[in-house]
Amino acid sequence: MNEEIQTLLIYQICDSLRFQANMEDISVDDVMDVMQENIMVECLLDGVIMDKADVQKIVIQYVTDGELGEEAIGDKMESMYSNSRKKLLKEIDDLDNTISTNRKKDKLLNLYRDTVLNRLQNKKTVLDKLYHGMKEDSSVIRNRIYLERIKNETPNSIAELQLMLQRSIADCIMSEPIGSEKYNIAKEIQINLEDTIRFMKRALE
């Protein structure tokens, strides 16, 4: 909770004590008692603990030369409320813009992912079939990459997607004997991936 809202809250408590409880002299202890006993105030504070010194500073602001300036206090409270409202609305707008930007970014990343995978799948050598055919206990694969996850999850970046696909192809190449049919297929897929990445870079420029 920011200082303006804390100040507003204590001003409201002071007003309540003064006009509803008919208390001419308001002490810091009176304000502290309300803060500790009032469920609404407790919810507004939301776990924020204000010590006596903090409350005293705000109560002193409320009191002008030992007397309560009713009109001035009302104007100050209205000004603080207006400023807090503007700040809150700006925070909401900023959050909406961030969410909108993130959604657009996710859509672009998913589009890039789908385009790259579709171009690889449209070739006669299909990466996922080759990868699924590898032995589970292959000693050259430390952390097996599951291509279904690549297809269904939004990558954090284009670079991450390219890295995952590159690792998948490298796993295929490293797990097969040089010159074997699967080795040659994996090498061809490597060329296809490089061509696809170049194609996508040109498309995005």
Curated annotation (Swiss-Prot):
InterPro entries: EAF5 (IPR026226). GO terms for biological process: DNA repair; DNA replication-dependent chromatin assembly; nucleosome disassembly; positive regulation of transcription elongation by RNA polymerase II. GO terms for cellular component: cytosol; NuA4 histone acetyltransferase complex; nucleosome disassembly/reassembly complex. Its main location: nucleus. Keywords: Chromatin regulator, DNA damage, DNA repair, Nucleus, Transcription, Transcription regulation. It is found in: Nucleus. Component of the NuA4 histone acetyltransferase complex. Component of the NuA4 histone acetyltransferase complex which is involved in transcriptional activation of selected genes principally by acetylation of nucleosomal histone H4 and H2A. The NuA4 complex is also involved in DNA repair. Belongs to the EAF5 family. This is Chromatin modification-related protein EAF5.
